[in-house]
């Protein structure tokens, strides 16, 4: 009996902490620190981003593009430090939306949450569209020779099946997701690291000086910024550890650790994997002209059976990434709906008593993530649009945190704190984030093309829209839809819990958080 006391008291403490924010403990609190880290690391998933946009970096700067990796990792680590401190103060589902809610005006918070929600939904689309890049060659290696890896139709079918599967798994609960995540993270870390070492030891065709081989491309600020997009697509989503705070034990301590270690782990594992793939390129000229992705390079170096095993490991890692991103987006949608801030908030905020999951939110996120497949143009274009919106959300969040710091926040001590370094970290993170936003928005065929520049892959059917960079169109449309809803109905809604607790459950104290600092 005594052995269970710490667990019980810990659960009661976490539930009481959540009640202080005006929320009832409905989601099942079953994640430890490693599981929290695993979910955040799975969201980042170096293998997923590298498989999606490796060809973009290679065809822009050759092997030199690997130097974009530490630059982006450092910039994102500064953002992560900022987020880690805030997550220690506000351990509730919704990350950037919740932080801006407590530190800024209502309108600012709502639009930040709206943009971040659709950035997450687009990211779900992008990662399920990435899985076929590794899975189809792996299935072909197992004898499914009829699958055409170059067919957008085949890729689309595999992506939609993946979306359906991860939706069902998320409906059945965070504990199941955590078990799969924990296993998948170990596979990804060991698989990427071990296979990279094998590539460097036994298939080192280029030599380590490949990192200085630009393959004849001019190395300058413009080309370096364009080559950054693979790295930019990988290292984000670390705030997922905070998004799942209501399902994490002792989240004020666990979430900040998971946020930071997920970035560090992704930087190390992803960097080693990138180097291994680059040195294993049989012929740089052929790889550049053929826009090789990692699957092609792996198949060129290993026997069919060995390459198939490796691609299956990578496919598993990407699948876990899909699962994690879906889980994080569902929690954000749930957090906003619980506060009565979205259309159909009541059903979206309803938690199934037996599953402890918001079932309708899971379904809604899946349906919205499927919409881009109506005009499917490949994983790369969706990935760039999704990443640009994520960085916009992060930048909006960092602005609010900086404003709060200027007014004396934090005034209350939390387990993780930056102290006097907080303002310095925040300022540099804003400078980095702002420069990356300009980079995302800059119109260029490689990273923010107009539909007319996609070679027929994408057309909106409206002449002048096809001449506007894709990211601009996506942001404007999503912001416009949000503005129409907010000013027509949303702004008249209070931040209020819209689902009543079960009859036998105590009603938590309503109102603002006792430790809210403005």
Task: Label each residue range with its predicted role.
Residues 1-54, 58-64, 77-81, 212, ...:
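Membrane-interface "cap" regions at the ends of multi-pass membrane proteins
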Residues 48-149, 262-268, 272, 471-478:
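Extracellular loop-to-transmembrane helix junctions
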Residues 65-66, 142-156, 182-308, 457:
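Helix-loop-helix junctions that connect adjacent transmembrane segments
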Residues 92, 115-130, 235, 239-248, ...:
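Membrane-helix boundary/coupling elements in multi-pass transport proteins
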Residues 98-101, 128-157, 191, 245-265, ...:
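Helix-loop-helix connectors at the membrane interface of multi-pass transporters/channels
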Residues 98-100, 105, 136-144, 258-323, ...:
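TM-loop-TM module centered on a large, flexible mid-protein loop between adjacent transmembrane helices
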Residues 154-205, 259-264, 383-397, 421-432, ...:
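Membrane-interface loop-to-helix entry segments
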Residues 380-390, 420-518:
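A generic transmembrane alpha-helix motif of multi-pass inner-membrane proteins
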């Amino acid at each position: 009996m005594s052995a269970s006391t710490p667990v019980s008291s810990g659960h009661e403490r976490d539930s009481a902490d959540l009640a202080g924010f005006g929320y009832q403990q409905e989601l099942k609190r079953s994640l430890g620190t490693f599981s929290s880290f695993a979910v955040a690391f799975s969201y980042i998933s170096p293998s997923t981003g590298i498989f999606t946009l490796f060809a973009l970096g290679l065809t822009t700067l050759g092997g030199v593009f690997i130097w974009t990796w530490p630059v982006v990792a450092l910039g994102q680590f500064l953002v992560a430090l900022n987020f880690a401190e805030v997550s220690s103060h506000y351990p509730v589902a919704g990350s950037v939306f919740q932080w801006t809610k407590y530190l800024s005006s209502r309108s600012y918070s709502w639009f930040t949450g709206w943009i971040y929600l659709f950035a997450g939904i687009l990211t779900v689309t992008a990662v399920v569209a990435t899985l076929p890049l590794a899975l189809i060659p792996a299935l072909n290696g197992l004898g499914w020779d009829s699958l055409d890896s170059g067919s957008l139709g085949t890729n689309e079918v595999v992506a939609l099946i993946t979306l359906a599967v991860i939706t069902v798994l998320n409906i059945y609960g965070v504990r199941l997701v955590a078990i799969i995540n924990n296993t998948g993270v170990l596979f990804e870390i060991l698989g990427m690291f071990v296979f990279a070492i094998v590539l460097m030891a036994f298939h080192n065709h280029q030599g380590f000086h490949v990192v200085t081989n630009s393959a004849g491309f001019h190395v300058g600020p413009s080309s370096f910024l364009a080559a950054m997009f693979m790295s930019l697509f990988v290292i984000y989503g670390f705030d997922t550890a905070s998004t799942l705070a209501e399902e994490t034990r002792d989240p004020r301590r666990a979430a900040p650790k998971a946020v930071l270690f997920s970035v560090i782990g992704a930087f190390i594992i992803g960097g080693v994997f990138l180097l291994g793939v680059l040195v294993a390129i049989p012929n740089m000229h052929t790889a550049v002209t053929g826009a090789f992705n990692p699957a092609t390079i792996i198949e060129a170096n290993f026997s069919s059976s060995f390459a198939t095993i490796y691609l299956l490991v990578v496919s598993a890692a990407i699948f876990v990434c899909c699962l994690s991103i879906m889980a994080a987006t569902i929690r954000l949608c749930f957090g906003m709906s619980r506060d009565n801030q979205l259309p159909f908030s009541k059903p979206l905020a309803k938690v199934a008593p037996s599953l402890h999951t918001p079932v309708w939110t899971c379904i809604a996120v899946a349906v919205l993530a499927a919409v881009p497949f109506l005009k499917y143009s490949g994983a790369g274009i969706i990935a760039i649009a999704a990443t640009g919106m994520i960085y916009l959300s992060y930048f909006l969040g960092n602005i609010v945190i900086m404003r709060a710091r200027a007014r004396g926040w934090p005034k209350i001590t939390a387990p993780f704190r930056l102290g006097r370094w907080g303002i310095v970290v925040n300022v540099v993170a804003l400078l980095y984030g702002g420069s990356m936003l300009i980079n995302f928005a800059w119109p260029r065929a490689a990273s923010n093309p107009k539909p007319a520049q996609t070679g027929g892959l994408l057309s909106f059917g409206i002449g002048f829209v096809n001449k506007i960079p894709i990211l601009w169109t996506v942001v404007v449309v999503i912001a416009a839809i949000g503005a129409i809803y907010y000013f027509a109905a949303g702004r008249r809604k209070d931040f209020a819990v819209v689902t009543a607790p079960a009859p036998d459950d105590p009603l938590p104290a309503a109102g603002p958080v006792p430790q809210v600092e403005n």
